[in-house]
Swiss-Prot record:
Keywords: Cytoplasm, Decarboxylase, Lyase, Porphyrin biosynthesis. The keyword Cytoplasm applies. It catalyses: uroporphyrinogen III + 4 H(+) = coproporphyrinogen III + 4 CO2. Belongs to the uroporphyrinogen decarboxylase family. This is Uroporphyrinogen decarboxylase. It is found in: Cytoplasm. The gene is hemE. The keyword Cytoplasm applies. Catalyzes the decarboxylation of four acetate groups of uroporphyrinogen-III to yield coproporphyrinogen-III. The record marks 78 as: Transition state stabilizer.
Amino acid sequence: MTGQRAEKPVLRVLGGEAVWPPPVWLMRQAGRYLPEYRKLREKAGNFIALCTTPPLATEVTLQPVRRFGMDAAILFSDILILPWALGQKLRFAEGEGPRLERIDGLAGLEALDPAALRQGTEPVMETVSRVRAELPPETTLIGFAGSPFTVACYMIDGRGGDFPLTREVAYADPALLAAVIETVTTATIDYLSWQIEAGADCVMLFDSWAGLLPPDLFRAHVIHPTARIVEQLRVRHPGVKVIGFPRLGGLMTLPYIADTGVDAVGMDTSVDPVALARLAPRRVAFQGNLDPLLLRAGGISLGQAVERIARGLEGHPHIFNLGHGIVPDTPPEHVAAVIERLRSLEPGELEESALAAT
């Protein structure tokens, strides 16, 4: 890692340093709540075009950095670009979310073309390179992918929801789920590696639906694939930092921390950050976990929550973020208020912080 990269606050935290005030970026910080995003979305015509047209995707990625001075930019894309690049048909229905042509057996999986992944994701890599060239030197660029289980949920069910087909397949046809996850895991290693080569400082794995699984399947389909991705990325890119987000993982977050090798764990809004830091089997950075609905609501409670979360993890490596993505009708001024409040906080007395005993 270069000296310049080491000076970036987010990377300092991912390296195990407690930085005050904690650096901040927000999941879905580039999105429909911003009027400048809505203009570009209309110009693109459809969501896939927005993700795969590098000048537009670059501009969308940079918008929240310019407006709010975020400490990190996260690549603007979608977790379903990966199966789409493999050959699975994808469309985004207005008001209904993504629709994939379902994989309902091994024949459907075998119809995908891993050799097409590089060409299919080349626009993403161009976007990473363009963003890298335009970011302020202190701003971290985060690449990302969906974690294998979460991507498999969409590939098998074909749409969002509570994924009843995928959950049934886990029991009725475990070989199919294992094969889909194997395909996605292998592709994700390449996909994230190419993002790093294109200029990403670190990467994040979004396992938005990890909490659907019972403990034995969580180990098999969340922990094990994540550990493999982390291991292989570090073989190719020694020292690269990885953030994992096992959303709604509950107590399984502890073995996730122990066994995956991630450098930071994203916390959803159900997590008590101080309790997790005390129970964690090894020292990792934490990311989160302001409620997106409180961000939308604003008011006195918003400022109080910002300070409570930040103070609770003072002295521990922490990246301030949300517990899930920004909701579309969030007032941008509420985001600005969070940044202002966070950066106005003076360092406290560490011996009095919530983690003093850890």
